[in-house]
Regions:
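Short strand-turn segments of transmembrane beta-barrel domains in outer membranes
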Residues: 196-203, 212-249, 261-272, 788
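Gram-negative outer-membrane beta-barrel transporters
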Residues: 674-676, 697-802, 907
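Short acidic/polar hinge/loop motifs at secondary-structure boundaries
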Residues: 138-142, 169-200, 216-223, 325
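Outer-membrane beta-barrel signature, preferentially recognizing the C-terminal barrel domain
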Residues: 324-348, 352, 543, 593-602, ...
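Signature of Gram-negative outer-membrane beta-barrel scaffolds
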Residues: 449, 475-612, 637, 739
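Surface-exposed extracellular loop regions of Gram-negative outer-membrane beta-barrel proteins
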Residues: 305-307, 311-316, 520-521, 525-530, ...
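C-terminal beta-signal and adjacent terminal beta-strands/loops
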Residues: 677, 723, 791-814, 845-910
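Acidic/polar loop-and-plug regions of large Gram-negative outer-membrane beta-barrel proteins
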Residues: 286, 294-352, 375-451, 515-533, ...
Length: 910
C-alpha cells in the first residue's frame, strides 16, 4: 500500500512542462492586510481574456494577443482596479502585486470571534471567523457570523474535518482533532490575516480536509506599522474587552516586531452565576536576512478562567420563566459560587524558516511547541443526596400527588437554597463528619467535594511546505508534517469543602460488592488512599500519539480551465499508558497498553471551467481514509486499556459542484454537496439506572450522509448599497445500524454489544436549514449601516443510543400491539428544536483624525427583536427508565441563547 502511494506521488512529479505562451500574471492582495484575495476576476479589457485569482492570490492569462491593453480587476467587497499594460509576444508579463482597496468602511477584525468558537467545549463548532480578506464567498460570510447563534456547522461537519494551520504548522489537537479557537484569546488584531480554503478546494499550505482548510499568518513584517487600540463593551459572557497591538513594520536592518495584548472580563455574565477572566499576550518577531531567507518567531498564550452554565429541563425553564437559568451556582457567604469553572491555558511557540531562492520556489519549514492546560470543576459526593438542584427527584413532575407538586413548585419559585446549589448544606455535612470523627474516633472523610477534571496535552509539531511554480500556469505544492503528542487525563481535589480528606475508592463498587476489596480500588498500587487538596485520584493515564503525513498536489491555471489534483498519505499510532492499577481491571489498566497503528491515504481532484470572465463552473471530489481519534477509540479509558473491537479507519467519500458568477454589480455562488462517512465512532458517558453504575457507551461502524445546497448572492444596488442573500437546505442523517458497546465502570458485568437502530435519524446539534437576507449601506461621511434577517430551522436534539436499542421488556408494559408501536415511537422520537427568526443590526463610523490616525466606532445589536426562545442545542439523556419505560422521567435537556445582545467597540489607529 505504501509503495503504491509513493509511486503515485512520484508520478505526479513527472508532469511535463508546456509551451510558453503570451499573456500576463500577478498576485491580488488586500491593500490593508496584504492577505491574498481569492476569486478576484482579472480581465484584459480589449480582448476579453480573463482569469480568476487562486487561494494565494495569484493569476495568469496565457492566450492573450501582444500589444497594448488595460488590465481590469474586480472582486466583491473591493473597489475596481485598472492599469495599462504592454503585452509582449511569447512572454508572460508580470504585472506584480495588485492591491485592492476594500469597500468596507469599518475594520471587521475588531469584532470578537463568535462565542460558539471560543467556548464550545465539545469542539463541534465549525464556523469560520469573519476576518479581513478571508473570503468573498457570501454564504461563508453568513455562516461565520449570522448563523452562529444556533451553533451552525458548515455542511454539518464537526470541526475535526477542518484543518487549521498557523504559519503552515498544523494546530488541530491530537485528541479531538479540532482547532481550539479559545487558545487565540480574543487577539483578533494579531490573528486577522487568515486564508480560507472552502470545502474541497486546493490550498497552498495543506492538503486540507472535507471541511476545508484555514491558515492564519502571523509574520511580523506583514502587519501594517503603527499602533491599534480598542475597548469594547458587550452584554454576553463577558462585558469588557480591551486590546492593543503595535507593529514596527520591517526596518532597514531587516527586523520586524508585532506585539499584542488583550483582556476580557466579567464578574457576572448574562447567565446568572457566570464570570469570565482572560488575559492574552502575543509576540511576533521576524528577521529578514536577505530576499532569500527569513526567520520568524511567534508566541502567544491566553490564561482563561470562566464559569460555565449547564443544560437543564424545559420544566425548570418554564417554572422560573427564565430560559437562562443555570443550575451550576449557589450562594456562599453572600457571593455567587459556580461549581463548573473552566480553566484553560495554551502557551504556544512557532518558529518558521522561509526560503525563497527565486520567484518560482518557496519552502516554509515550521516547528511548533504547545502545552495545553485544560480543566473543569464539578461536584462529587459519597453516600449522600445529589447536590445538583435540577436532579430529577427534585422536580415537581417526579411526584404524582398534586399537593407535593405544588410544594416543590413553590420551593423552586421562592427558595434559592433549593433552586440553586446549597453550598452551606454541603459544608455542614462535612463539618458533621469532622465532629463525629472527633467524638467517636472513627475516621470520616468528606461527603461532598469539588473535583477538577484535567485533560492536558503537550504537542510538538513539524511542518514543511513547498511551492514550486513549474511554469507560468502550473504549480507544484507539497508538504510533510509530523506531530508528537502526550495527552494526560486525571482528577484532582479542588476543595474538600470543610472536610478532612477523600477516600479514593469507587462508591458504586463498594455499594454492590462491599466484600470485594480489590474491585472497589481505584488504584491497587495505593489502596484505600486518603487524598487531599490538589492530590490526584480516581483515574490517571496518558495517551501518547504520533501522527505523520505527506501530501502533494498540482495546480494548473489555464485560460478556460483551473485544474488541481493531489494525494496524501498518513501514519497514526497511539498507546494508553496507565498510572493507576484499577481494581475493576487490574491486569489491563496500569502501564503501557496495546499500540494501535493506522496507515491512511486520500486523493482529491478539482476543476473549474471558466465560461467567460464572469461565469464559471467548478467541481471537486475526494476519497480518503482517516484514523479514528483516540478520544473516541477507547471504551473506558479511565478504567482500562480496551479499545473498540476491530478498530478501523474512517472512510470518506465527498463531492461538490458549483456555479460561480462575478459581475461588477452581481456576485454569487450556488453549490451542491454530498458526503458519505463510514466507520465513524462516537463515545458518551452517563449514569445507567438499570445497573446503577456509571456507563461508558461507544458507537462504532457509524455511517452518516451529508448533502445539501448552499447559495450566496450579493447585488450592488448603488456604489454604496449592497443586498446580500445566503442560505442552505441540507440533510444530515445516520444511514445504518451501528454497533453499540456498553462498559460498566463498577465491573458488575462484562462489556456488551448490541445493534443500535439509528438509520434515517438526523445528526443533531446544528440547523439543517439556514437563510439570511441583509442590506449594507456605506453611507457618506464614512458611516456604515447593516441590517440582516436570519431564519434557522431543522435543528434536532442529539440522540442517545440507549433509546434505539432493542428493548425486550417493553412489551410487558404494553397491553396491545398498537400500544407497543406507539410506545416505541415515543421512546425513539427525535425532537426538533424551535425554528427561529433573528434580526441583527450594526452601525459604524470611521473618523480620520489626521493622515495617519483614525477613530473607529462600531455598534452591533444582535437579536434586535429580543427573541428569548432560541434553543441553541439539546440532547437526549443517557439515563433511561427501564422499569416503566417512561420518557418523562429523564426528558431532554436544552441550552438557550440570550435575548438582545449588544457589542460596542471603539478603536483607534495611529
Amino acid at each position: 500500500m505504501r509503495l503504491k502511494m509513493f509511486l503515485l506521488l512520484a508520478l505526479m512529479l513527472a508532469v511535463p512542462a508546456m509551451a510558453q505562451r503570451t499573456g500576463i500574471k500577478g498576485i491580488v492582495v488586500d491593500s490593508k492586510t496584504g492577505v491574498p484575495v481569492h476569486g478576484a476576476t482579472v480581465m484584459l479589457d480589449g480582448q476579453g481574456a480573463s482569469a480568476t485569482s487562486t487561494l494565494d492570490g495569484s493569476f495568469v492569462i496565457t492566450d492573450a494577443t501582444a500589444g497594448s491593453d488595460v488590465v481590469l480587476v474586480f472582486s466583491y467587497g473591493y473597489k475596481d482596479w485598472s492599469q495599462d499594460v504592454v503585452i509582449e509576444s511569447n512572454r508572460i508579463v508580470d504585472v506584480g502585486t495588485i492591491r485592492l482597496t476594500s469597500t468596507r468602511s469599518y475594520d471587521n477584525a475588531e469584532f470578537a470571534l463568535t462565542e460558539s468558537q471560543i467556548e464550545d467545549e465539545e469542539g463541534n463548532s465549525q464556523t469560520i471567523a469573519t476576518l479581513t480578506g478571508a473570503t468573498d464567498n457570501v454564504f461563508y460570510q453568513a455562516a461565520s457570523y449570522d448563523f452562529s447563534l444556533m451553533r451552525f456547522r458548515i455542511r454539518g461537519y464537526d470541526s475535526e474535518y477542518t484543518q487549521t494551520t498557523i504559519n503552515g504548522v498544523t494546530m488541530n489537537d491530537a485528541a479531538r482533532g479540532r482547532f481550539n479557537y479559545s487558545m487565540l484569546g480574543g487577539l483578533n488584531q494579531a490573528f486577522k490575516n487568515k486564508s480560507i480554503g472552502m470545502g474541497l478546494e486546493a490550498t497552498a499550505y495543506s492538503f486540507g480536509d472535507v471541511g476545508g482548510a484555514n491558515n492564519i499568518a502571523t509574520y511580523a513584517k506583514d502587519y501594517a506599522p503603527g499602533t491599534r487600540a480598542s475597548v469594547a463593551y458587550t452584554n454576553g459572557n463577558y462585558y469588557l474587552r480591551g486590546m492593543i497591538t503595535h507593529a514596527t513594520g520591517l526596518n532597514k536592518h531587516g527586523w520586524a516586531l508585532t506585539a499584542s495584548a488583550a483582556v476580557r472580563y466579567s464578574d457576572q455574565g448574562i447567565v446568572p452565576g457566570s464570570f469570565y477572566n482572560s488575559a492574552s499576550l502575543f509576540l511576533s518577531l521576524q528577521k529578514v536576512f536577505n530576499p532569500q531567507h527569513s526567520l520568524s518567531l511567534t508566541a502567544f498564550g491566553a490564561p482563561t478562567s470562566r464559569a460555565a452554565n449547564t443544560a437543564t429541563y424545559q420544566e425548570i425553564y418554564d417554572i422560573l420563566d427564565n430560559n437562562l437559568y443555570n443550575p451550576s451556582w449557589g450562594w456562599q457567604d453572600g457571593k455567587k459560587r459556580n461549581a463548573k469553572v473552566v480553566e484553560a491555558f495554551d502557551p504556544t511557540a512557532i518558529i518558521n524558516w522561509i526560503w525563497t531562492p527565486n520567484d518560482r520556489l518557496s519552502l516554509n519549514t515550521g516547528v511548533a511547541v504547545s502545552k495545553s492546560f485544560y480543566s473543569s470543576s464539578a461536584l462529587n459526593w459519597y453516600k449522600s443526596a445529589d447536590p445538583r438542584p435540577d436532579y430529577y427527584r427534585y422536580l415537581p413532575s417526579y411526584y404524582e400527588d398534586q399537593d407535593v407538586k405544588d410544594l416543590y413548585t413553590h420551593k423552586w419559585l421562592t427558595d434559592e437554597s433549593f433552586s440553586q446549589i446549597n453550598w452551606d448544606a454541603l459544608y455542614q455535612a462535612n463539618y458533621l463528619n469532622n465532629l463525629q470523627a472527633q467524638e467517636t474516633g472513627e475516621e470520616r472523610g468528606s461527603t461532598y467535594i469539588l473535583e477538577r477534571r484535567h485533560s492536558n496535552q503537550l504537542n510538538t509539531s513539524l511542518n514543511s511546505t513547498l511551492n514550486l511554480r513549474l511554469n507560468d500556469y502550473m504549480t507544484l505544492q507539497a508538504g510533510i508534517s509530523a506531530r508528537f503528542s502526550q495527552a494526560s487525563y486525571y482528577k484532582t481535589i479542588k476543595d474538600l469543602l470543610g472536610g478532612r480528606y477523600w477516600k479514593d475508592i469507587d462508591q458504586f463498587s463498594e455499594r454492590d460488592y462491599p466484600n470485594d476489596y480489590t474491585l472497589l480500588q481505584n488504584d491497587m498500587n495505593n489502596p484505600d488512599r486518603k487524598v487531599g487538596k490538589d492530590d490526584r485520584f480516581g483515574y490517571d493515564y496518558n495517551i501518547n500519539s504520533i501522527y505523520a503525513t505527506a501530501w502533494l498536489q498540482n495546480v494548473i491555471n489555464l485560460n478556460h480551465w483551473d485544474i488541481n489534483y493531489g494525494l496524501t498519505m498518513s501514519y497514526t499510532q497511539y498507546q494508553r499508558d496507565g498510572k493507576m492499577r484499577n481494581g475493576r481491571s487490574p491486569e489491563n489498566s496500569y502501564g503501557k497498553g496495546e499500540m494501535h497503528k493506522f496507515d491512511n491515504a486520500g486523493i482529491k481532484a478539482g476543476a473549474t471551467y471558466k465560461i467567460d470572465g464572469r461565469n464559471s463552473i467548478s467541481a471537486h471530489a475526494y476519497y480518503g481514509t482517516k484514523a479514528p481519534l483516540f478520544d473516541k477509540a477507547y471504551i473506558s479509558p479511565r478504567i482500562k486499556d480496551d479499545a473498540i473491537a476491530d478498530l478501523q479507519s474512517e472512510r470518506i467519500l465527498s463531492g461538490d459542484i458549483s456555479y460561480n458568477f462575478n459581475y461588477r454589480r452581481f456576485h454569487g455562488t450556488i453549490t451542491g454537496f454530498w458526503t458519505d462517512m463510514y466507520n465513524q465512532t462516537e463515545r458518551t458517558s452517563f449514569y445507567d439506572d438499570q445497573f446503577s453504575t456509571f456507563m461508558n457507551y461507544v458507537l462504532s461502524g457509524v455511517k452518516k450522509t451529508y448533502k445539501g445546497v448552499e447559495v450566496g448572492l450579493a447585488y450592488r444596488l448603488t456604489p454604496s448599497i449592497t443586498i446580500n442573500a445566503a442560505g442552505t437546505f441540507s440533510r444530515y442523517q445516520y444511514k445504518n445500524r451501528p454497533t453499540g458497546t456498553r462498559s460498566y465502570e463498577n465491573g458488575q458485568a462484562p462489556d456488551t454489544t448490541q445493534v443500535v437502530y439509528l438509520k434515517n435519524y438526523y445528526v443533531g446539534g446544528t440547523p439543517q436549514q439556514a437563510y439570511s437576507l441583509g442590506i449594507k449601506w456605506n453611507a457618506p461621511g464614512m458611516w456604515f449601516l447593516e441590517l440582516n434577517g436570519v431564519y434557522m430551522a431543522d435543528s434536532y436534539v442529539s440522540l442517545s443510543p440507549v433509546r434505539h436499542e432493542a428493548m425486550p421488556g417493553l412489551y410487558k408494559v404494553c397491553e396491545t400491539e398498537e400500544e407497543l408501536i406507539q410506545k416505541t415511537a415515543e421512546i425513539t422520537r427525535q425532537e426538533r428544536l424551535n425554528d427561529n427568526f433573528v434580526l441583527n443590526a450594526s452601525i459604524g463610523k470611521l473618523i480620520y483624525l489626521n493622515r495617519t490616525a483614525s477613530l473607529n466606532i462600531n455598534l452591533n445589536v444582535d437579536n434586535v427583536l429580543n427573541n428569548r426562545n432560541i434553543q441553541t442545542s439539546g440532547y437526549q439523556q443517557g439515563r433511561f427508565d427501564y422499569t416503566n419505560f417512561s420518557t418523562s422521567k429523564y426528558p431532554n435537556k436544552y441550552y438557550y441563547a440570550q435575548g438582545i445582545k449588544l457589542y460596542l467597540n471603539i478603536g483607534v489607529k495611529f
